[in-house]
Amino acid sequence: MTNITTGTEVPNLRDETLEKTVWFDPDELDYLPLEEGEHSDVEIDHFQRTIYDYNGAQPIVVDRECNIVAGRGRVEAARLLGIDEIPAIPLSSFSSDDLDHYIDTMIRFGAFVGWSAEMLEADLQHLLVIEALMKAGRGDTTAKIQ
């Protein structure tokens, strides 16, 4: 697949993502130097709560040298919780330029993403419907929210 705007090849991450999720000791991972500030204590607390509540379900992203590309806050939270292993997706096929572009894109994307109370309420209501359906033994989690 070719990127329409730049003409560059878009990597196919399907195989890499689905087949190569690995587990790392958080202390084996290194941080890439970033110009952006570190996460606040409040943000780390939120990461810890999410890991605790959802069993750390979201993998981090690492490069071929085990540098954290995405998920610094989750790694720090896992360390503070004393977690021995966390899931990671290695982007070993990325060049240095690819990684720089990926990180820049993720930082820019993060700056544009915002949440409102209304968005959170809608998400919560959807999750409550799914939970109720699952408890009722119905596998149909696509029901419309009233």
Regions found by a protein language model. Give the residues of each.
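Short, charged/polar connector segments at secondary-structure boundaries
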Residues: 1-92, 99-146
